[in-house]
From Swiss-Prot:
[4Fe-4S] cluster binds at residues 407, 410, 414. Keywords: 4Fe-4S, Iron, Iron-sulfur, Lyase, Metal-binding, S-adenosyl-L-methionine, Thiamine biosynthesis, Zinc. Its EC number is 4.1.99.17. It is an enzyme of class 4 (lyase). Pfam families: ThiC_Rad_SAM. GO terms for molecular function: 4 iron, 4 sulfur cluster binding; carbon-carbon lyase activity; zinc ion binding. This is Phosphomethylpyrimidine synthase. Substrate binds at residues 66, 95, 124, 163, 185-187, 226-229, 265, 292. Binds 1 [4Fe-4S] cluster per subunit. The cluster is coordinated with 3 cysteines and an exchangeable S-adenosyl-L-methionine. It comes from the Archaea. Catalyzes the synthesis of the hydroxymethylpyrimidine phosphate (HMP-P) moiety of thiamine from aminoimidazole ribotide (AIR) in a radical S-adenosyl-L-methionine (SAM)-dependent reaction. Transmembrane segments: none annotated.
Amino acid sequence: MTQLEAAKRGEITEEMKFIAEREGIDPEKLRRSVAKGYTVIFRNVRHDWVKPVAVGNVVRVKVNANIGTSRDIVNVKAEIEKAKVAVKYGADTIMDLSTGGDLDSIRKAIMHAVDVPIGTVPIYQAAEEMLAKGKAIIEMSEDDMWNAVEKHFKDGVDYTTIHVGVTKEVVEKMKRVKRVVGMVSRGGTFLAAWILHWGEENPFYRDYDYLLELAKEYDVVLSLGDGLRPGGLPDAGDELQIAELYTLGRLVRRAREAGVQTMVEGPGHVPIDQIPAQIKLAKVATDNAPFYVLGPIVTDIFPGYDHITSAIGGAIAALNGADFLCYVTPAEHLGLPTVEHVREGVIAAKIAAHAVNLTRFEADFKKDYLMSLARGKLDWARQFELSQDREKFIEIRKERPTKTEACSMCGDLCAIKLINDMLRKG
């Protein structure tokens, strides 16, 4: 029985109890949201050691960190370190997007290195295996695609991105609807190219019921991928993006009827003023399915700083209903991220998520309240304890010391110290 089926029956599962306690919410409130499909729980039945995580409308906004090898750089130890660093700095989930090396062993190593839910994009493996054989990606058979999906499910991944909305119909529209950037989703492009080459329907769309059967067996959350997300600001909100979105909405409803948990992925690159409307449209089109966004990135001309451009968009998206933020690192659009890039990306995304969470959860606001108290007292030890990045706190304090009880920015001119001293004197 899946979490969705249990919730529909009125059952509060052990995973729901665990999550409700961690989130500080009523288990029954969580159950009702799961039953409606508004919240999903990541916990593959074969992933025994994972601490389940929920994403949806009654829990905190969550953050995902993407890691993984590439065909140019295969360093498994580095990827495991990235996973550990991401979790240390607050990532709620990890996606292994490896495309180089022994993908099966890499995936398993990452899964055993951390205790958070793991997501993948199975078609990456199907494509990589074609290249490893000296074949073109479009030579993938339907069995190759399905075998990759089932392998990931059996290995215990908790959610998978499946670009089921890249249909033959929408691919035909691509010939007419011109984009500035084109198609930037790797998995979506693999399927679009395959459709164009063979003239066949996307197997995941055509045989969606079979996909639901597989997902149901392992209680894997299907993350319905946005293969036609905008890859640049000029393409935001175009016909292709919206057509795919409505297809995903229909597939969400079919999954719920089958007892399978689903969430929907979203953009992408979006001008800042369009973000609220895009999120609200997505929520309506998908009947309030949990919405998982990459950014959105709000400007395209700051490569090297896209952890910041995405955090800005992520905060606005979350405030307007996005439930799950995929981090972006400073290396986005430039190359494979380093461990330090991962750390910076997670922190930026966590800032965006926390900025929204503190408006909804008293416990989250209390953290900021306590920091304000500590700052008002110039209590540096307490500020250190409350800091989300203690290493950075210490680094700056040591680099820029002062002999005063304030910081080296103001020293004896510190506004807080001056007014506190005067108030104490009466």
